[in-house]
Amino acid sequence: MKAVALALFLAGAANGYTGSAACGQCHQAIAESYKNTAMARSFRAVQPGIRLPEFDGRAFLHQASRQTFTPVTEAGRYLVSRQQSTSGFQPFRMAVDYILGSGDHARSYLHKAPDNALLELPVSWYARRGGYWEMSPGYDRAGHQGFTREVNARCLFCHNAYPQKNKLGEGIDCERCHGPGDQHVKDAKRASIVNPARLPAERSLEVCLQCHLETTSGDLPGSRLRPGRDVFSYRPGEPLGDYQQYLDHAPDAGQGEKFEIVSSAYRMRQAACYRARPEKLGCTACHDVHRQMSRAETVAKTQQVCTSCHAQTQHEPSGDCVNCHMPTRETEDVPHVEMTDHKIGIGLRPFTALVRRDDVPYGGDVVAYYPPGGTVGITTAPPLSPKRKDYTANGQALLRAGKVTAAVAAFRTAVNTRPEVADIRVNLAAALIAQNDYPAAQEQLEEAIRTGPSIEVARGAWLAARKAGAPLPTAREKYDDSLRTQMLSAHSNLGVVLDHMGDHEGAIKEFRRAVECDPSSAAAKQNLRQALTR
């Protein structure tokens, strides 16, 4: 069974990468100025001496979930505490180990779990209006994921250097744009390193597009890796389409004006100015990637770019073309962040975005966006009928009632209905373990790990099923060794195992911990209630 939690410690993301420290030995001035850019500050570990003044002990109440979050500092560590308003349980707390985001717009916070997985904390700090706390992207709803949301390799791809063996980088580094530098360091020859400025215009732009092109963060697969490619296999200078295919809503879906936090390149490619002269209006026409530009410098540079084509204007130049023709406004997917709209245009557009309806699944066609043309081979499923029988919930109820054979049948039906959902296979594995059918449980777990983008559900109570026929006491020992103490699913799963072993007190203890992890979880409270009433 392969490890699938975030690949924090890869066996080396790429041959030939040497690390940006080697670059700074020769390119000292660039290395020094680059340290202050948002890209360089996009990801970092919490080390002694790092100051996060936003962890000031001021509580933040999230009305939808009735949970109060308090960012605090204790003994040199930064933590977020959560208290359920209607719960008598002790507050649940989690420490901050990594900072995601430069802080120019926002900062999110990650915790490193015992198995090296990175978990996103449910609250983030936003820079607008002097700075304030709000829910992290995707969390502003009653049934949010709490402290269990796992950050995967795709999330980190655009926030960090490529990871090396036993080492996670800190921020976008030189080699993300210039490619592997080992040979260049050895040869000290210009030809042995990629310089995006010397690439053809399309290849040069794609160095930026690898991170700054996203069609949507919503309910589509916004992109798909090409067969045989892994997340960290893109090399600057190669055609981006050889690495992955970008996908989008069909043109007639009415989604063309979406404005999201990573929409800069998507919107720029819609602009008439860009379409007229794409070879001239790339990202670096206005942006200096090696240093943090001041507001005045940015205005002056963009003004120069605009007037190089628009020397004759229909109004008195204001000195700041961007202010009117590329206004900033709230993004649809992260409402607390304002970004510059790169779809250069005439006339004001709304500054406040409509809240995107993530609860309404998209049921239309998916098309190839970049590179354009060709077949996609993807169709989105229409919204499920509310009358559809929920076989998973039925199986869980049957398993709690001790009707193991019926539970196995229900979960198998659910798997046949939704084979791509890893959680259902883990539920089936639980029922198979209750039947002492360890080989079948192992098979389901391995398939769950292959199909699931996150394996928090597959690394819990049934880790011992990797060895077919292992007795349950051994399963408990193995699970205790790998237990991720913050996981709702981990405590719930261990509670189920202990309950089947006859250790009811141990099961109650784990069910209590599950409720403390997420007091809003109806399933966790149901498990505890049933265990207490036996």
What do these predicted regions represent?
Residues R400, A434, K467-A468, H500, ...:
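Register position in tetratricopeptide repeats
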Residues A21, A29-S102, S108-A113, P122, ...:
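Primarily the internal scaffold of c-type cytochrome electron-transfer domains
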Residues K387, V421, S454-I455, M487, ...:
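Residue-level recognition of tetratricopeptide repeat
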Residues T392-Q396, D423-I433, R459-L463, L488-V496, ...:
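Conserved alpha-helical positions within TPR/SEL1-like repeat arrays
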Residues T417, T451, S482-T485, C517:
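Structural marker of alpha-solenoid helical repeat scaffolds
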